[in-house]
């Protein structure tokens, strides 16, 4: 009797285990993967996809940075070492996510994954900051005569000729169109996007950001009027305008892009400090108090609201809070080269840059995250 019951139990367990294994491989078969080793990797990648890279801590690492300020593609305003910044600790921090691993940037792996493809970073000067970082991370593994830079309208593109890969930047800080109207007045068209979006077609990976320009004060605003449909507005709640602009972008993505051909990522806002808050900072903040948390909750809520309405899968790529710890990473007064006398009498003033980031620096870690997202097929 005992033997009979044991056999029944054994057969039941076999059936259960068989169903589990089959269900796992059925799932993998749906994505067209017949190789069991690749199948296991696919499962690991899907688990990795659920990891939140934005939660973690900064750890000092002497092996960083991954390139130096001699990178020929760096803007002078971001080359803090060239501009005389005396400390270099800000270059030596890596981000350790709490619940998953974040590998060091591997230029050959990234280029191998992007072989024959285009990646375009679309947005404002903070996205240009990230583009320069990404180009510097990959260019050192390429022979000098096998890479080049080209320009087309608001875009600039770095090309790896051997990998047939292009890493592109498109200047579109508001995503929607900003045009001159009657009497040369600047009009922000909340429902028009094609003038910018025509450059996004045919790209394999699109990475967007848009936030800072929407909240510029009246003095620094880039437009005189808003236009939505046939209506013109002198004033509008910035977050209402932001939502309408993002909705126009979302509609364009869903109508014009094919999710099987183009992966879309939206990067959250890069935190910025006001006044002298980043001057003479040499280490990451140990914690974020209520007064040091980035002031971007409205933009985050609006962005999430719009993304939730979309059928097109968009990967939300969160760098805001992790970057808020890094006041030490901004150029501050080292956004330009200084004379010897200035170096000895440095003072923080209105000209301090507490928005952009020194390179090498924080955007390199953003690109480690971006590379991991792409390499693990998380998007």
From Swiss-Prot:
InterPro entries for this protein: TBL (IPR029962), TBL_C (IPR026057), TBL_N (IPR025846)
Disulfide bond as UniProt keyword: no
Pfam family, one: PC-Esterase
Positions occupied by motif DCXHWCLPGXXDXWN motif: 353-367
Topology of this chain in the membrane: Single-pass type II membrane protein
Motif (GDS motif): 123-125
Cellular compartments per GO CC: membrane
Localization per Swiss-Prot or TrEMBL: Membrane
Lyase as UniProt keyword: no
Main localisation: membrane
Keyword set, alphabetical order: Membrane, Signal-anchor, Transmembrane, Transmembrane helix
Transmembrane domains' residue ranges: 8-24
GO molecular function terms noted in the UniProt entry: O-acetyltransferase activity
Reported function: May act as a bridging protein that binds pectin and other cell wall polysaccharides. Probably involved in maintaining esterification of pectins. May be involved in the specific O-acetylation of cell wall polymers.
More details: Contains 2 motifs that are conserved in esterases, but it is unlikely that this protein belongs to the catalytically active pectin esterases.
UniProt record similarity statement: Belongs to the PC-esterase family. TBL subfamily.
Name used for this protein in its record: Protein trichome birefringence-like 36
Lineage summary: Eukaryota, Viridiplantae, Streptophyta, Embryophyta, Tracheophyta
């Amino acid at each position: 009797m005992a033997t009979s019951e044991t056999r029944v139990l054994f057969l039941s367990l076999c059936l259960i285990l068989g169903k589990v294994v089959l269900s796992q491989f059925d799932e993998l078969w749906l994505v067209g993967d017949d190789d069991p080793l690749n199948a296991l990797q696919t499962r690991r990648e899907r688990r990795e996809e659920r990891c939140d890279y934005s939660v973690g801590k900064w750890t000092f690492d002497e092996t960083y940075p991954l390139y130096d300020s001699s990178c020929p593609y760096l803007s002078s305003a971001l080359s803090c070492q060239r501009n005389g910044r005396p400390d270099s600790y800000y270059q030596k921090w890596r981000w350790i996510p709490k619940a998953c691993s974040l590998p060091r940037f591997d230029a050959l792996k990234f280029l191998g994954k992007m072989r024959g493809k285009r990646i375009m970073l679309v947005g404002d000067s903070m996205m240009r900051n990230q583009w320069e970082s990404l180009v510097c991370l990959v260019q050192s593994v390429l022979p000098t005569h096998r890479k080049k830079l080209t320009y087309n309208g608001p875009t600039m593109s770095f090309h790896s000729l051997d990998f047939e890969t292009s890493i592109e930047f498109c200047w579109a800080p508001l995503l929607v169109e900003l045009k001159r109207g009657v009497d040369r007045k600047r009009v922000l068209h909340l429902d028009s996007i094609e003038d910018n979006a025509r450059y996004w077609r045919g790209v394999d990976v699109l990475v967007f950001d848009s936030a800072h320009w929407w909240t510029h004060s009246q003095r620094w605003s880039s437009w005189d009027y808003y236009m939505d449909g046939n209506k013109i507005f002198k004033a509008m709640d910035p977050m209402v305008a932001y939502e309408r602009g993002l909705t126009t972008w979302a509609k364009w993505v869903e109508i014009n892009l094919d999710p099987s051909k183009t992966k879309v990522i939206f990067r959250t806002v890069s935190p910025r400090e006001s006044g002298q808050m980043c001057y003479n900072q040499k280490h990451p903040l140990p914690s974020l108090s209520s007064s040091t948390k980035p002031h971007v909750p409205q933009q985050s809520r609006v962005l999430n609201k719009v993304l939730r309405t979309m059928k097109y899968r968009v990967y939300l790529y969160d760098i805001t809070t992790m970057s808020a710890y890094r006041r030490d990473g901004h150029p501050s007064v080292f956004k330009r080269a200084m004379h010897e006398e200035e170096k000895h009498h440095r003072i923080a003033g209105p000209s301090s840059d507490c928005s952009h980031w020194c390179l090498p620096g924080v955007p390199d870690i953003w690109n480690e995250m971006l590379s991991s997202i792409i390499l693990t097929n998380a998007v």
